[in-house]
């Protein structure tokens, strides 16, 4: 859309959405700051005293399993550890909405599974609203309460919405093996497959 309005919790959004936290695919950590200082940076920007911000940063690093890595710099961290620092950085600000754009897509399969379970555990503790963008249908089903399928671009739009009535708490590896998961995957894939084929066809036409 090129016109219209956006409301967040019933109020018009006219600038930066300060009630939302963001986690993207790319690495956004500051290379000259250690893990503690990266997490504390946003808190300091929002007015926390430096000592308080560092203490809160240590608390959040502990929650994501990196309490012992607080003084390590990004180049000393693995891909999964960097993502956990970024997750702590976002959650430390206590956003009411989490906007996550393919945050785990660059990770290996094992690390990705660990990070997905980490996200589920942290979500269970606070129950924030999460908008999670992914190209991985299995990931969408394993994590979500609803899956919205978008049409092939460039003028992408919602073409289907599915309720994910799988029980919580979940383990992303174990839930994939349940009959209910398989049934949901089959149902959603019937719609998604058509959009994937349209995208491939459009790409083939552009190359000829």
Protein language model annotation of sequence segments:
Residues 3-15:
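Conserved ABC transporter NBD signature motif
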Residues 16, 36, 62, 70-73:
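Signature (C-motif/LSGGQ) region and adjacent switch/coupling loops
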Residues 33-41:
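Short coil-to-helix segment of the ABC ATPase nucleotide-binding domain corresponding to the Q-loop/switch region
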Residues 40, 44, 51-69, 121:
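Conserved ABC ATPase "signature" region
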Residues 72-75, 93:
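Conserved signature/switch motifs of ABC ATPase nucleotide-binding domains
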Residues 87:
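Hydrophobic anchor residue at the start of the ABC signature
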Residues 98-101:
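Catalytic Walker B motif of ABC-type/P-loop ATPase nucleotide-binding domains
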């Amino acid at each position: 859309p090129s016109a219209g309005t956006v409301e967040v919790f019933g109020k018009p959004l006219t600038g930066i959405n300060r009630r939302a936290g963001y986690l993207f695919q790319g690495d956004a950590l500051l290379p000259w700051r250690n893990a503690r200082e990266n997490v504390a940076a946003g808190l300091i920007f929002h007015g926390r005293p430096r000592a308080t911000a560092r203490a809160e940063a240590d608390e959040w690093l502990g929650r994501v399993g990196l309490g012992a890595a607080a003084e390590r710099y990004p180049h000393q961290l693995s891909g999964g550890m960097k993502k956990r620092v970024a997750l702590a950085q976002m959650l430390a600000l206590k956003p009411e909405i989490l906007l996550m754009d393919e945050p785990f897509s660059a990770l290996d399969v094992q690390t990705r599974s660990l990070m997905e379970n980490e996200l589920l555990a942290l979500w269970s503790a606070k129950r924030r609203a999460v908008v999670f963008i992914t190209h991985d249908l299995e990931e969408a089903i394993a994590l979500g309460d609803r899956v919205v399928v978008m049409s092939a671009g460039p003028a992408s739009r919602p073409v289907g919405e599915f309720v994910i009535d799988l029980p919580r708490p979940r383990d992303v590896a174990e839930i994939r093996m349940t009959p209910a998961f398989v049934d949901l995957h089959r149902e959603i894939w019937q719609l998604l497959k058509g959009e994937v084929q349209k995208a491939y066809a459009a790409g083939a036409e552009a190359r000829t």
